[in-house]
């Protein structure tokens, strides 16, 4: 009889027996459901009897991090590994290497060779990898290697070009996908006693994590072993499998502590060139990006332009908001399955680029449109930027 049971401190007890919440969950599928009427009929504990579930406990990672024992991706090592330092192309997309002259690098002690990367996933284009016995040698040699490219179409695109395109998009009432469409914002604007319009811009933002991007890759027994810090393993493993023409089950990702993620390590694109180099050389390759290269290869938060139009009635109260924002969409490039559906069923949008515009305030007429800035999308790989 449920009335004879008591739930407290993570344990259900009664009739001389007890079962922890963890044991209940571990026993399998909890499929019991309740109708609204059944839920309403359930007794609710008075406030005086309510307690917090769980108890204070020490974070498991603090001792190792405090002592300097924690192993980050940058710390990972394997016997016989060599080091790789990238030389990135002038554009994220479309640049093709014409020639590589490494004659000035050959006298550098420890320099081995410079590789090109053929990535069928399309995320790494026009990159060269300088291989050396040590990372200092790889860094020094990368400054001596001369690479010439046929630059991609966006080589001359500037920040201002992207923002200008964004302004043009938000000023066009026919563009975008409806994220919110409550009431009739257009009619309220037409009938307003007063209106207010403002346009806002944000600039490109880099992640600049304390630990630059890195990856150590080894092929062993027909499997690709990747050692790196990562925030979304199931996002990069399919990309690696496509790029390497391998089965996903043969991509083994060993995850380490992050020296800062902030969304940059949601996508592990730095693993791609390291994996290709490790397979080409048949030995472990540790790729490390210096800060300048890490910045050039970053999946930046896109510049954005947002326009807000507000309408006010005769009483001075807010009667409508029309909000539109244009930016590059990370989800479109990296996780299109997570794109949201427009409220009218006409098109998809990146919720991470517009969330928050569907605010909790009561406005009788509220419309929000999300616009993909294609110029931004074609110029760089937009990324998620997260912080607290």
Predicted regions and their residues:
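N-proximal accessory regions
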Residues: 47-106, 124, 132-141, 162-163
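Flexible hinge/switch segments at interdomain interfaces of large molecular machines
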Residues: 73-82, 208-213, 365-378
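Alpha-helical support elements that line or immediately flank enzyme active sites
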Residues: 1, 83-111, 128-148, 215-281, ...
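Fold-independent oxyanion-binding glycine-rich loops
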Residues: 69, 89-90, 133, 192, ...
């Amino acid at each position: 009889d449920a009335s004879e049971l008591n739930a407290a401190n993570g344990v259900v007890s009664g009739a001389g027996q007890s079962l922890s919440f963890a044991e209940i969950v571990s026993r399998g599928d909890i499929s019991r459901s309740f109708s609204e009427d059944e839920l309403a009929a359930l007794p609710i504990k008075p406030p005086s009897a309510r307690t917090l579930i769980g108890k204070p406990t020490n974070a498991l990672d603090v001792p190792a991090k405090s002592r300097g024992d924690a192993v980050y991706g940058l710390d990972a090592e394997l016997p016989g590994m060599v080091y790789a330092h990238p030389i990135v192309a002038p554009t994220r997309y479309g640049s093709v290497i014409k020639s590589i002259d490494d004659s000035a690098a050959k006298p550098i002690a420890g320099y081995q060779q410079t590789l090109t990367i053929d990535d069928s996933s399309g995320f790494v284009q026009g990159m060269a990898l300088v291989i050396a016995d040590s990372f200092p040698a790889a860094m020094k040699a990368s400054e001596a290697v001369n690479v010439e490219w046929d630059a991609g179409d966006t080589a001359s695109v500037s920040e201002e070009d992207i923002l200008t395109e964004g302004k043009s998009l938000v000023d066009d009432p026919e563009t975008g996908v409806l994220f919110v469409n409550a009431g009739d914002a257009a009619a309220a604007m037409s009938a307003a006693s007063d209106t207010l319009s403002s346009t806002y811009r944000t600039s490109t933002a880099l992640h600049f994590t304390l630990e630059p991007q890195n990856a150590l890759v080894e092929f062993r027994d027909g499997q690709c072993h990747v050692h790196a810090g990562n925030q979304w393993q199931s996002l990069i493993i399919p990309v690696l499998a496509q790029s390497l023409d391998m089965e996903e089950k043969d991509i083994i990702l060993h995850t380490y502590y992050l020296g800062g993620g902030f969304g940059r390590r949601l996508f592990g694109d730095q693993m791609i060139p390291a994996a290709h180099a490790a397979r080409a050389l048949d030995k472990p390759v540790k790729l490390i990006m210096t800060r300048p290269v890490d910045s050039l290869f970053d999946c930046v938060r896109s510049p954005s332009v947002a326009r807000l139009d507000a309408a006010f009635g005769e009483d001075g109260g807010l009667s409508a908001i029309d909000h539109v924002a244009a930016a590059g969409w990370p989800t479109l490039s990296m996780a299109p399955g997570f794109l949201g559906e427009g409220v009218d069923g006409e098109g998809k949008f990146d919720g991470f680029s517009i969330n928050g515009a569907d605010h909790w305030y009561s406005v009788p007429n509220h419309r929000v449109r999300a616009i993909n800035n294609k110029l931004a999308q074609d110029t760089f790989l937009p990324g998620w930027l997260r912080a607290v």
